[in-house]
Amino acid sequence: MYNLFLTAPSGTGKSTIIEKILCRLNVSIGGFQVKRYLNKKGEMYFDMISFMDKKSNNIIGEYMGNKKTLPNLYTFENKGVEILNTSLTNSDLIILDEIGFLEEKAEKFKSSVRNILNSDKVVLGVLKEFDSPFLNEIRSRKDITLLNVTLKNRDYITNHILNILSSWNIPMKLYENEMIP
């Protein structure tokens, strides 16, 4: 089992690192990325975007003010599970960007995440820096490589991650004039 997760405070660049890595990989990509958006009223919400079909408008949470975010369990338990199950069947590498606290009560979704982590698929993900039973369960797994992204290492950690993925036999794209080690 090949499971690599990044963790760091918000705004450190974890998702940006994953996007840079995806540009270098020569495999089919599944999974999801959560993006934060503001609607026309200025309200913040969180959208789960599938890497399989690029579809968005899968609202998993809405910021309610006072540092409270209301999870949308229906989206996790339906669209989220669909994204994960389709990815497990149809992709070589699965992105989980990000696993946080909103899905704590989404039992079907958490079960699908466990199935992916137990599979032979390569997983590249982000774990929110938060204390919760599900996040702690993932962190404590023996088959997890957990890398801490900092402002000091974020510019060179991408190459380290690419080397790990290469050692796991993930094919990379080669570019003209690129040296092959």
Per-region residue spans from a language model:
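Hydrophobic anchor at the beta1->P-loop junction of P-loop NTPases
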Residues: 6
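The conserved Walker
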Residues: 10
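Conserved glycine(s) of the Walker
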Residues: 13
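Hydrophobic positions on the alpha1 helix immediately C-terminal to the Walker A/P-loop
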Residues: 17, 21
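N-terminal phosphate/diphosphate-binding loop that engages ATP/GTP or pyrophosphate donors
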Residues: 23-68
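Phosphate-binding/switch loop-helix module in NTP-utilizing enzymes
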Residues: 65-114
